[in-house]
């Protein structure tokens, strides 16, 4: 609770007088921050499923400390990646003449069986009369190795039907040995030039069956690995501000993440029925992102938002707009974003129900 955190940090005396804020002028600033985040990460790890994953956004000030803490809590072997996110365009009036425009999204898994993925470009499979009901694709049969590196793969392939010869390139040998070629030929896994009119190939290629691809890939079939370079269309902090201003009619929250950023992270790491927990909910961007992603892919993800009822400054736009604490901002955003998404779906002929529950 907020009270427990204040007690741990020694922020009040016995008469409940505030002693200090945890600002960067506090000599124990980093230690206090580390103590606060450590306890929350321990709880987060306990709540993760075995194939679960956590994303944590941080700026330069604590990125190094956060990585060390996460290595201890989740294990260094479960570090997935760091995604640099550009939060703003460069500013000129900055210390040392360097504009710090990025935050860093650290990703850790509960266990090593997690794998991020995105929908990949669909592979081209062919259906031919000679293999009815067995779609197949082709793959290069060469490898980036020289004849001296792989002498067993430096040989001439001969088409048993036509006698046509295909010598290996000394700078790029075959990916298989001569014995393996014979085995693959018997298994119908070698495709030669001229076998199919629709294939424009100049040398033998390898045939892969779609059924084998599906068996090997399992749930990840049709998907590819993701890059730490985030997509260009996920937005910056100013886009997050526009979103919440358009929804609530006021700049009710400072520096909110754009929903597109959170939606992308959820899309690469979750299944359609997963739970998504955000225990620094703020303006409830995560809830907005979950609802939007569900609307787009037909998923049934549920979200849990956790936020202390921190009071809004009376001089802030949020307070003037009627929001007394941050929780009220988040609840109203969830309501309005949910109704907007619902209206958009119904305009497209989709009938959905909107349900809101609050636990106290």
Question: Where do the protein language model's features map onto the residues?
Answer:
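A phosphate-binding catalytic loop at a beta-strand-loop-alpha-helix junction
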Residues: 274-293
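PRPP-dependent phosphoribosyltransferase catalytic core
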Residues: 292-360
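Class I S-adenosyl-L-methionine
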Residues: 1-275, 297, 308-314
């Amino acid at each position: 609770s907020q009270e427990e955190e204040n007690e741990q940090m020694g922020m009040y005396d016995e008469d409940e007088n505030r002693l200090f804020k945890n600002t960067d002028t506090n000599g124990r600033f980093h230690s206090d921050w580390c103590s606060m985040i450590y306890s929350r990460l321990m709880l987060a790890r306990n709540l993760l499923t075995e194939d679960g994953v956590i994303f944590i956004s941080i700026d330069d000030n604590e990125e190094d400390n956060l990585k060390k803490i996460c290595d201890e809590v989740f294990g260094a072997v479960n570090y997935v990646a760091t995604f640099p996110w550009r939060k703003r365009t460069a500013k000129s009036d900055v210390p040392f003449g360097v504009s710090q425009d990025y935050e860093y999204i650290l990703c850790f898994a509960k266990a090593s069986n997690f794998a991020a993925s995105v929908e990949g470009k669909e592979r081209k499979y062919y259906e031919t009369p000679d293999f009815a009901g067995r779609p197949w694709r082709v793959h290069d049969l060469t490898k980036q190795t020289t004849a001296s590196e792989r002498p067993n793969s430096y040989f001439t392939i001969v088409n048993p039907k036509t006698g046509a010869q295909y010598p290996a390139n000394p700078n790029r040998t075959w990916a298989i040995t001569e014995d393996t070629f014979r085995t693959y030929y018997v298994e119908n896994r070698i495709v030669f030039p001229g076998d199919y009119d629709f294939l424009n190939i100049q040398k033998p290629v390898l045939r892969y069956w779609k059924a084998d691809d599906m068996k090997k890939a399992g749930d990840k079939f049709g998907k590819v690995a993701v890059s730490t370079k985030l997509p260009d269309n996920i937005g910056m902090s100013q886009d997050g501000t526009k979103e919440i201003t358009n929804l609530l009619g006021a700049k009710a929250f400072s520096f909110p993440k754009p929903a597109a950023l959170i939606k992308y992270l959820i899309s690469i790491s979750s299944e359609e029925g997963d739970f998504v927990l955000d225990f620094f909910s703020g303006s409830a961007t995560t809830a907005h992102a979950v609802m939007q992603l569900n609307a787009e892919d037909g998923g049934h993800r549920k979200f849990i938002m956790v936020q202390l009822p921190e009071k809004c400054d009376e001089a802030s736009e949020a307070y003037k707009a009627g929001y007394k604490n941050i929780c009220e901002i988040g609840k109203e955003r969830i309501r309005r974003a949910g109704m907007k998404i619902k209206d958009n779906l119904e305009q497209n002929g989709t009938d959905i129900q909107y349900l809101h529950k609050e636990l106290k």
